[in-house]
Swiss-Prot record:
Organism: Cupriavidus pinatubonensis (strain JMP 134 / LMG 1197) (Cupriavidus necator (strain JMP 134))
Annotated positions binding beta-alanine: Q57
Enzyme Commission number(s) of this protein: 6.3.2.1
Name of the protein described by the UniProt record: Pantothenate synthetase
Subcellular location: Cytoplasm
Function of the protein: Catalyzes the condensation of pantoate with beta-alanine in an ATP-dependent reaction via a pantoyl-adenylate intermediate.
Amino acid sequence: MKVISSIQELRDQLRGQNRVAFVPTMGNLHEGHLSLMRLARQHGDPVVASIFVNRLQFGPNEDFDKYPRTLQDDIEKLQSEGVYVLFAPTERDMYPEPQEYRVDPPHDLGDILEGEFRPGFFKGVCTVVMKLFTAAQPRVAVFGKKDYQQLMIVRRMVHQFALPIEIVPAETVRAEDGLALSSRNRYLTEAERAEAPMLYRTLHDVRDTVLGSDRAATRLATVEADACATLAQRGWKPDYVSIRKRSNLQAPTPEEFAAGEPLVVLTAAKLGATRLIDNLEI
């Protein structure tokens, strides 16, 4: 596996490869990331991964400086998965001058849910993903469904810019107790780690309530509020539990809900100092 930091060197290395499968990451790789590499191999060849902790998507009070950086360990894991190239640029490689041009997602998708609680987050995500796409020029890119809103935003960006890239969604990988694998799980204390699966169980409770309800009579706002209250009673600080349409992440109208619109429930909540996100399709 070649480890490359320069955009030009990456382009030179991939010249003539017409079915690159690309997996962008921020490193500190776990089994969830490695499952993306395996899925990428099913859709293209060669597989190219990137590791870059992107300052543009971190807010002023977020964990950019303490975000775990484990490059050597990550390299060994990617080698074991048969990845062809790892693109691991420095900040200077990616942003040799101030990044004055940004990709700003539409407000109806970028300023809700995560975008409401992390202003500017998706602008940073879209900007770096677009730059990574222009560097690697893939035909396939794999994104995990754990970051459901990010997946939707990237998919729409690719469509509206007419990029010749197939976006492949990957199912969330979970621990045996249901907790979605995340690099931020390492911040949890032992007691918090024991409590953390409650987030996924709460999503299941919401799904069961919706599926078992009379859709014509059920108020989704009440279901969402009850789920937030359940988490709060257990010591969580929920930002949201929100039931949305899978198609565009807008709230369903009562008529759409009653007609059986495909839905997804998304959540973000703090447990101690650690903010976790998760989702479940209904």
